[in-house]
Regions:
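Pair of pore-lining "gating" transmembrane helices in MFS-fold secondary transporters
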Residues: 7-29
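Helix-loop junctions at membrane interfaces in 12-TM secondary transporters
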Residues: 10, 95-106
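Hydrophobic core of transmembrane alpha-helices in multi-pass small-molecule transporters
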Residues: 22, 89, 101-118
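Residue-level signature of mid-helix packing/kink "hotspots" within the transmembrane helices
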Residues: 28, 56-64, 151
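Intracellular juxtamembrane helix-capping segments at the cytosolic ends
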Residues: 37, 116-131, 138
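Helix-to-loop junctions at the C-terminal end of transmembrane segments
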Residues: 62-75
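C-terminal ends and interior cores of transmembrane alpha-helices
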Residues: 84-98
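Helix-loop-helix hairpin linking two adjacent transmembrane segments in secondary transporters
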Residues: 145-165
Length: 165
């Protein structure tokens, strides 16, 4: 059934992969998160900078780990772990008390960095495999989604902060 859908609607599958890749651009949208994080957790600009640095470092390490996990267990496993880590980072940060600013590093930066990194190679390699005849286009669509994600997430988060505080 899944194979039939993919065969009949290949561009829908690629669009879904691109939509998922928008989430991997979370580090590119850090600027919109920085001020609310500083206010909520009592972090200085330097402390928020450390949170961002840890997010980026976790992303870098996570790309290697996510690629390894994908080779061993497949892209579905890597994507599920990535989704769980990313969502877990947001949920943990949401329930973290405001006085525990240092906890933000552990609760959000590490799991969100790893989660976005686990998603990145799984979607990219699947696009290249499924669109073997159009690897360049498939890679371009997925890469373009990552590039546009910083702008999209920035606009989305700003609207959400205005609407929900």
């Amino acid at each position: 059934m899944k194979q039939q859908f993919a065969a009949k609607h290949p561009w829908t599958i690629l669009a879904a992969g691109a939509a998922i890749q928008v989430l991997t651009g979370l580090p590119a949208a850090w600027g919109v998160f920085q001020q609310p994080v500083m206010e909520e957790y009592g972090l200085s600009e330097q402390g928020a900078g450390y949170a961002f640095a840890l997010l980026i470092a976790s992303f870098g390490v996570g790309c290697v780990l996510g690629g390894f996990l994908q080779d061993k267990k497949g892209p579905r496993c890597a994507a599920l772990w990535g989704t769980a880590l990313l969502c877990g980072g947001f949920f943990a940060a949401a329930f973290l008390p405001g006085w525990a600013g240092w906890g933000f590093f552990l609760a959000f930066s590490i799991p969100a960095g790893l989660g976005t990194a686990f998603l990145y190679p799984s979607i990219q390699s699947c696009a290249q495999k499924w669109y073997a005849g159009r690897k360049g286009l498939a890679t371009g669509v997925i890469g373009g989604a990552v590039g546009l994600s910083g702008a999209f997430l920035t606009l989305f988060v700003r609207a959400a902060l205005r609407g929900f505080g």
